[in-house]
Amino acid sequence: PLDISGDFFSEAFQITDVNQNNLSEVWILYKLGCRGGVDPLDMKIIMYENGKKYAMRGTEKIIISYNKNTKNNNYTGGKYTYDEAFLNSKDQKILEFSKKLWNKYVFTPQD
């Protein structure tokens, strides 16, 4: 059986002022997809600042195999793209924070 999954991560919900411009940023992270196969779930970070929406989209990272000789995991997924708003902002503090948030939640261990 396949399970449809939609998970918001309440611990990822944050209100910040990362770039210290006296405008709060509101961060939301969620994953969507179908469990039951080996495909990674879609993952999205949305950030609002001063009424403007910014989005980062990609997939979670999952282990697909383990090499006993090198003791390394092989992964699939984990890549992301920024929307135009993020790219046009060119705010390095915001981009760095978004990457840290992404990397904190990108990996989902499989049962």
Predicted regions and their residues:
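Long, contiguous hydrophobic alpha-helical segments, chiefly transmembrane helices and signal peptides
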Residues: 1, 26-28, 46
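Short consensus segments that form the blades of beta-propeller domains
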Residues: 2-6, 33-39
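Beta-propeller blade termini
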Residues: 9-18
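Short, surface-exposed coil-to-beta transition loops
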Residues: 11, 27, 39-43
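Extracellular/periplasmic catalytic domains that process cell-envelope and extracellular macromolecules
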Residues: 19-20, 38-40
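Acidic, small-residue rich beta-repeat scaffolds with periodic aromatic anchors
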Residues: 41-44, 48-111
